[in-house]
Amino acid sequence: MKRFVTLTALVVCAASAEAAPETYVIDNSRTSSQFSYRYLGLANQTQRFEKISGTMVFDPATQSGSADVTIDATSVNTGQALLNAQMRAADFFDTANYPVITFKSGKMILSGEQSSLSGELTIKGVTRPVTLAVTHFQCMQDSSLQAETCGAQASVTVRRSDFNMGKFPFLVSNDITLNLAFKAVKAQSYMQVASRDSGR
């Protein structure tokens, strides 16, 4: 009887461990963050941020989770030094006072085309509730990294004026679309992957 109880406990523990939520660390070198807007009411322009960090928790049993993402606003890159400076200035991101953009999500729902991340987006010290549309979410063993990874694309359209960035509406559209294409590495393996990358 004692042996049966012990075996049962081991099976339950193994099942719990298998279904437990896993933490993944965003790999900046394999992640991109962009924002696009309409310039002069004509063509769309797309710019990017070079530095993104954060974590994601994913529960495969319930197909749900959460995310905590930080974008270094000072890393904005338009390909032009003058425009970079304008983007960092007080009229736009004001990186001297607000060097980071954050997104904290406590609710991730994965359901085909209805997949989403709901949470709070903070830009320039202003926090607003947003829901990001999520596509191409997949977790898998990445043979090139020798680690389990999760990746997806997420996007949301916000209004600049909601974040104290509404100046020059005749130049830049009020609507801005944020796009994030990320790859995250399981936390237990992240340092090994980062160490191999730095040694290249």
Question: What kind of feature is each model-predicted range?
Answer:
Residues 2-7:
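Sec-dependent signal peptide recognition
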Residues 10-18:
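Hydrophobic h-region of N-terminal signal peptides that target proteins for export
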Residues 8-11, 111:
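Compositionally biased amphipathic helical and low-complexity segments enriched in hydrophobic
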Residues 19-200:
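Low-complexity, acidic/polar, glycine-enriched regions of mature
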